[in-house]
Structure formats: C-alpha cells, structure tokens
Amino acid sequence: MARTTPISLYRNIGISAHIDAGKTTTTERILFYTGVSHKIGEVHDGAATMDWMEQEQERGITITSAATTAFWSGMSQQFPQHRINVIDTPGHVDFTIEVERSMRVLDGAVMVYCAVGGVQPQSETVWRQANKYKVPRIAFVNKMDRTGANFLRVVEQIKTRLGGNAVPLQLPIGAEDNFKGVVDLIKMKAINWNEADQGMTFTYEDIPAEMLAECEKWRANLVEAAAESSDELMDKFFSGDELTEEEIKKGLRLRALKTEIILVTCGSAFKNKGVQAMLDAVIDYLPAPTDIEAIKGINPDETEGERHASDDEPFAALAFKIATDPFVGNLTFFRVYSGVVESGATVLNSVKDKRERFGRIVQMHANKREEIKEVRAGDIAAAIGLKDVGTGDTLCAMDAPIILERMEFPEPVISVAVEPKTKADQEKMGLALGRLAQEDPSFRVHTDEESGETIISGMGELHLDIIVDRMRREFKVEANIGKPQVSYRETIRTRVNDVEGKHAKQSGGRGQYGHVVIDLYPLEPEGPGYEFVNEIKGGVIPGEYIPAVDKGIQEQLKSGPLAGYPVVDLGVRLHFGSYHDVDSSELAFKLAASLAFKAAFNKANPVLLEPIMKVEVETPPDYVGDVIGDLSRRRAMVSGQEANEFVVKINAEVPLAEMFGYATDLRSQTQGRASYSMEPLKYAEAPKNVADAVIEARKK
C-alpha cells in the first residue's frame, strides 16, 4: 500500500489545559468541523466522544488520553487535506502522568486557557512538561462568551506566569454576551461564523471601526515577531516595506517551531466560534513530524542511534499508553517514528528483548475504531494482541534493534490498603490490579510483608479513588479501602566513621565469617539517592565479596531501621574488614554489611522525611482568611498570594499527611467556590512530634 497522506501534511498534536478550561468541548468541536462526528457531543450532557470511560461521563472530567485521527483542509479549503492526530490529555493534576506521557509522543500542542480563569495552576505544570520535551505550542483562549472574559489579560499571564512570548494572531470582537467573532490580524478582516450551521461556514467582513486602531497596534506586533525570524525579513521590515501574508506566516512558523513565540487565538468552543480558525493555525504553525529533530535512541552496542521520520528507515515506534478495552482486551497505543509495519508482522520489544506479533492494528476515533492494514512514520495507532508491552517500551524491526528514550515516571506519594470483600473477589482483585498497573506506570501495587495487606500507591486521592472505581466497574471486584498512608522516607544527618559489622558463626562443620568496616555519610537530596564506594586496599576483603556487601546494604535501604520506610540520600564507604579462607561466603558478607549498616544508621542522627506538596488554592476574596487559617492548622508555609477582583491565589507548601480530606473541607469553608491543585514538591524533615507519632504507630 502506498502512503495516502504525505508525512509533511501530518500534525500530531495534544490538547491540554486546566481542568475546566473547556478542553474536551474544544476537542469535540475539532471532530465536528473536521467532519468526523455529525452531532456535537456536549460534556455537560455526558455525551462527549473523547470521554469514553463511564466514569469520565459521570464526573465530567477526562481521565484517559484518547487518540483520534481527523482530516482538515482549512476554513476556506485553502490547504491540501491534512491529517491531524489529536491526543486529548487530562487536566487534573492526579493524572499528570498521562499528560507527561502524551507530551512525549506529540509534535505540537494546543494549550487551552479559560478567558476568565486565565493561567491556572495545572496550566503551569503542563507548560513545564511541554518545555521539558521542547514541544512547540499555540494557545487557544476559550470561553470568550463567559462573564469576566478578558483576552488580553490571559495573553499577559502567558508572558508573566509561564514566561512564554505570547503573540496574538487574533483579537476578539466583543466579549461575554457580546462576543461576536474574531479579527484575523494577518488578513486584517473580521471573521463572522454562521450560527445557523453551527459555525461550519463563515464570512470575512470589515473590522468594526471602533476596533481599528487596536487591531493595527497588535498587527504591528505580529509582523515584527515574524520579521525577527530572519535577517532578510528584518531588513525588509526596517526599510518600511510591507511583508506579504506568505512572508508573515513563514516567519511566524519558523519562530513557533523553535518555541520562540506562542501564537494566541481565541473563541468560544461552546458557541461554535474560533475552533475553526485555531485548526488553521495548527496547520500553519505547528510542526509536521519532518519538522522536528530525529528521535534519539540507544543501539544494542550502547552507542547512540537515531531514527528520522521517514518510511524508508527501519521500523521504530514507542508504546505510550496501554488501555483495557471491554471488547478486545489490551489496546497498546503507539507512535510510529520511522518505517512501516503491517498487521500480522513480528517486531521486537527491544526494552524486554522479546518478540511481539502485531495482531490487528486499529486507528482510534475516540472509542470507535477502524481496522487498518499498515501504519507508517508519523502515525499514531493502537495494536490489539501484544502480549508483554508496557508504557515506554520500544517496538522495532527485528533486524534493526534500537531502544528509544525511556519515559521517566514520578514516584507515588500516597498509599492505601485494599482488601477484597469476599473470597471470590480475592483472585479477581490481583488480576485487576495487575492490569491497571500495566496501564498506568504511576500506580503501584505491592504486598506489605508484615501485615500481608495489599497496598496500592498513586499520585493523589482522586487517582486512587478512580482506580478502585474502575476495579468495581470493569473487573466487578468489590473492595474495602483503608485509610490513606503517606509514603515517608528515612535518611541521616551526620557522618559516622569506622562502624564495624561482624557475622561469625563457628559451631562445628563449615562456619560463616564476614567482617566489614564502613563509613556512612549523608548525600544531597535530588542526587543519586545512594552511592557505594569501595576503598578496600590490599585484598583484606576479596573482590568477589564486595558486591555482596553492596547488596546487603541495599536490601536494608528498602525498609529503614527507624520505622521501616525506604532509606534515601546516603553514601557508604567500605574501607576495611577481614575474611576467613574457608568460612567466608557471600551470604556471610551480606549479613555483616547489614549489621554494620544498622549500627551506623542509628548513630548517624537518623531522621524521618515527609512528602511536602506544592498547593495552590484559588478562592473568592471573601474566604481568604478562613482558607489561610485552615492551611496554617495543616502546618502549611504560605509562600505568597496574588489577587484580582474575582479571585485570590494562595501558594503554600503543605505536608501531604495534613492534606487528606482537604477537598471536602475546602468546599465547606467556601461554599464550593474555591478550587485547589497540589503536586509533589520535595521531601523535608518531619518535626520531632510528627516523626515520633509516625514511628510509634509503626511499632504497634
């Protein structure tokens, strides 16, 4: 089969935003205008096409990032037909993992902001993730029809809060109830969408006279931004010559692709205005797969390799999401970076070094699927029937193995114990949790060795609620949930030298003998977490036993002497010891090392670390006193506030242990008018009274 759409006409984009900026509605409109769905799905009647898990429709929030293919030839049919693969990403901070994961496989992003709320906490998290993966982006200021909508305020916030060089491509005509349409600053024409056909058609009109001066000012700003893309355009600009529409677009595209500027569009997805022009901007200013750098990877011989976006290179793809589908089982979403693969082909999972066979390949449209015979460079599709592929694994040609960059996933910060309600649920629960953990790398399952309980850990209360909810719905497992537990850590504050550990057992027959002397010292947080330095001189401990010493200590790190929590940020220097020709063994040295470690740890001023969250609360001004008072009771350090007439933003650092149930408390303090977001910030030493209580509770 030949390629149907040239790769230069592909756009792989993500749509991401704060939880209520109207992102799913925006995506729905994209599907409507590109002719994929004939009836617009509204989020508030639970019919949105992209939100296809039952829970999403109930809660009105997007949980799983669905990938959808759409086609667009421009509002005036001015482009050849482009293929847009849209990845809808969740906006709730408990699901940042989904956002991070989709950023990894996108080429460009549309950031949706609410014209009233502006740049909200989650927008900043998403922005940082887009920076991390150098994703070019444009902004869409949505909800221009809402009371309090202010386009230029949001443009200003993109500059001040996100550090983005925001350049408006359009200005809104009117706002709130009077929002009529937008002015295209390149064409200097007003765009008026036809309400009778839900904005499918439009007319260009003259700019309202009272807006002309403002439009000219912002157009000059736009043209200057375009001119700065090259010396040639700069010369033309300064000599007073008009830049052509083509030159302006070319200049803006160059700078947008280098992430030097963020072009800003606006509209109201709900009122069917603006999304159409934003789609044109996606094609004009966001990259095709061929516009971005080749993806880097590691060859089998550990040298660096790369793959270009071309059908002629060997096949390489990255699995970025595993979803369980009620009809076909596991769906593995993957992005093809190079080459071609047909359904039925055998490929290599280079991360696990296992062969996999592509059973069927489907192109997803929200939760409808179309079976296809092959996929090519630039495509995003889902495979059915892969056996052992996890998120972040590479699938590649058998004869050209490469491991593409791995994704890094955050450590969970909150855990709860779950127990099945009946014996019959027991087995199903293990299966369900295993399946869910495979889908979501930020969710972990383990069994507590002492209590035998099953512990699940995740990124926040909502995250775990949804996991338990999915267990009930999709796997029909009823479970009881324990109280949330905080993931504490242990570390040391002072260095101790020359601590010895000796394991000697001589009781007839072959004995056991291992003897080590170590120093223990603290490491900086954010570093490697653990280091082992071997400074044994003159063979006082034979080389073959050194790894056993390291291993003995590492096993102790899993469950620290203070309260059984993982130990972090310390180094061990092994510098002396002794051995016995007959009685020494790896096991003896492992045991000696663990004895030395425990003794040294207890002398090194051990402390308990607790996770601190970065919390941002947005509240109407009337409730600020109550909110801050409540945060102080939760041991918060309030680091600042910003206010406008509608809302006060309070930034604080709060121990996670104090944040349980906060959503409910905040609702009752502010009659449901405040919202908050939190994300893990760091670990910090717990105050003595808190640490003592935690240690005491663990002894029971």
UniProtKB/Swiss-Prot annotation:
Residues 8-290 form the tr-type G domain. The keyword Heme does not apply. InterPro entries: EFG_II, EFG_III, EFG_III/V, EFG_IV, EFG_V, EFG_V-like, EFTu-like_2, G_TR_CS. GTP binds at residues 17-24, 88-92, 142-145. SMART domains: EFG_C, EFG_IV. GO terms for cellular component: cytoplasm. The keyword Transmembrane does not apply. It is found in: Cytoplasm. One of its GO terms (biological process) is ribosome disassembly. Keywords: Cytoplasm, Elongation factor, GTP-binding, Nucleotide-binding, Protein biosynthesis. GO terms for molecular function: GTP binding; GTPase activity; guanosine tetraphosphate binding; translation elongation factor activity. PROSITE patterns: G_TR_1 (PS00301), G_TR_2 (PS51722). Signal peptide: none annotated. Belongs to the TRAFAC class translation factor GTPase superfamily. Classic translation factor GTPase family. EF-G/EF-2 subfamily. NCBIfam families: EF-G, PRK12740.1-5, small_GTP. Catalyzes the GTP-dependent ribosomal translocation step during translation elongation. During this step, the ribosome changes from the pre-translocational (PRE) to the post-translocational (POST) state as the newly formed A-site-bound peptidyl-tRNA and P-site-bound deacylated tRNA move to the P and E sites, respectively. Catalyzes the coordinated movement of the two tRNA molecules, the mRNA and conformational changes in the ribosome. This is Elongation factor G. It comes from Histophilus somni (strain 2336). The lineage of its organism: Bacteria, Pseudomonadati, Pseudomonadota, Gammaproteobacteria, Pasteurellales.
